[in-house]
Amino acid sequence: MGIDTGTTATPRTLAEKVWDDHVVVSGGANEPDLIYIDLHLVHEVTSPQAFDGLRLAGRPVRRPDLTLATEDHNVPTVDIDKPIADPVSRTQVETLRRNCAEFGVRLYPMGDAEQGIVHVVGPQLGLTQPGMTVVCGDSHTSTHGAFGALAMGIGTSEVEHVLATQTLPLRPFKTMAVNVDGELPAGVTAKDIILALIAKIGTGGGQGHVIEYRGSAIESLSMEGRMTVCNMSIEAGARAGMIAPDDTTYEFLRDRPHAPKGAQWDAAMRYWQQLRTDPGAVFDTEVYLDAASLSPFVTWGTNPGQGVPLAAAVPDPELMTDDAERQAAEKALAYMDLRPGTPMRDIAVDAVFVGSCTNGRIEDLRVVADVLRGRKVAPGVRMLVVPGSMRVRAQAEAEGLGEVFTAAGAEWRQAGCSMCLGMNPDQLAPGERCAATSNRNFEGRQGKGGRTHLVSPAVAAATAVRGTLSAPADLD
């Protein structure tokens, strides 16, 4: 990758700079560009057929040193020393282990101190760095864009292509700027920003775009908060999300196991500091949010765009002027068993899930512990707190957070994707309602017939205590 000297005639966006630095072969006007990939992350669900393709063709993994695998989607978060009960999940995990051993790919299996959700593991090890291209057979690869990387999910055939060549044929994306300026009110978090954005532009609003998040409110976020925002770019329909690196980024990366050291750090910093959108660069689309007007947000329906402030009520489909929107709302309310006009704070839950690649990091767990400390989970509510990685779990234990969770009556688990999706034992029963810090509230996402409300960690913790959708301020 070269250093942008600022002499380019046409001002470029951050996404365009990273793209240009990774073009191996230009496709011109009619063909895709061939893009070099700096980091390829792999898990057990989308990789088996890709490795099979390599095996059939007699090809090795081109750059095993730039490839990292971890077990996350299918793994249990209790009794991890026992065999996985579900035969499909067990087969996928065992297949990943055999493939990584055969092709020389690093793997962090269950029980390893570095195992966890792939989008938590990469950043915490310092593997994800500004200006990189990052891919994974997982839609929420956009998480890594918080570092100023161009990161996107890919399909299994593309996973095979990257394993074989360390490149990917891609057509340039459109660009969108999401400007969030002003000071966030107390109790409003990164999760509330992204839920409010998706409610504003819809789940298709970012289709075909790479979103760059900008403005003073974004700059004020920690790296954990930035990862939350970029993680859910996909729920807005975008291909990727990015935030320009700054001092917050550099301090997070400094001294991480795989971060550059010494002279290499200095050289990397010279490149990283060029990774900003040029003055005068033009975005295809621009969106504005006033940070001061935001409040804790929660979804009421079955897609992430069906959300309202916690202080609001379940919307009335009859008041919606768009036919498709009205029909979708009616269908969602029927599935969610909600009535228009019901205050969101009156909605009782059966379960609370804290975790996922959206909100399973140490900062998220600290927020939850602050709310739970000295309090109890409401009777009849089951609360799961699942760290995004074993490293996060170890840090939480060192800070005494695990004791806070268990004293409150929550279940303190091992690392994994857990109740974010119904691919492991952590699932809702039909008809159960859950406040979840994850990223998707589709029908059956957390288990057949389960009903999901997407919330921030702060709202999740307060909800667990009150038993109804709540913010920490409601506990005072």
Curated annotation (Swiss-Prot):
Reaction it catalyzes: (2R,3S)-3-isopropylmalate = (2S)-2-isopropylmalate
Gene3D superfamilies: Aconitase, domain 3
Designated name of the protein: 3-isopropylmalate dehydratase large subunit
Keyword Glycoprotein: no
Pathway annotation: Amino-acid biosynthesis; L-leucine biosynthesis; L-leucine from 3-methyl-2-oxobutanoate: step 2/4
Pfam families xref list: Aconitase
EC number: 4.2.1.33
GO BP annotations listed: L-leucine biosynthetic process
Leading EC class: lyase
Keywords: 4Fe-4S, Amino-acid biosynthesis, Branched-chain amino acid biosynthesis, Iron, Iron-sulfur, Leucine biosynthesis, Lyase, Metal-binding
Primary gene name: leuC
Cofactor: [4Fe-4S] cluster
CDD domains referenced in this protein's UniProt entry, alphabetically: IPMI
Annotated family: Belongs to the aconitase/IPM isomerase family. LeuC type 1 subfamily.
Record note on cofactor: Binds 1 [4Fe-4S] cluster per subunit.
Purpose of the protein: Catalyzes the isomerization between 2-isopropylmalate and 3-isopropylmalate, via the formation of 2-isopropylmaleate.
GO MF annotation, one: 3-isopropylmalate dehydratase activity
Binding, [4Fe-4S] cluster: C357, C417, C420
The protein's assembly and partners: Heterodimer of LeuC and LeuD.
PANTHER family: 3-ISOPROPYLMALATE DEHYDRATASE, HOMOACONITASE, MITOCHONDRIAL-RELATED
